[in-house]
């Protein structure tokens, strides 16, 4: 039962992480968020939350949960290692996709070639994925691993 609750908590933590980041960026008027009104930012939060929840569910079932239990079995019940695993697993889909797109463009000699802005955007997406992975790992750790 705790594992099922942990999967639910990890899945729900990702949309909350996105809402926290987008809300903070809107409050601080950073970049695109500073130029848009709150209704559009709210729609963006809903869209990204709807997309990220199934991805978080799949990653928790396929990799995050088993990895957390393996770490706990090896005696690593502290939050730090579980957080690092969440950060890595959260960033992995973005790194793989961006690496595929940039690599394919380079191999096919597509014009225009990826510039520094493309790489910066890829790093931003990977950072958002890592942030969401940290929240999911924390939620799973609190519900399932802590206090074992």
Regions found by a protein language model. Name each.
Residues 1-148:
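Juxtamembrane/disordered regions of integral membrane proteins
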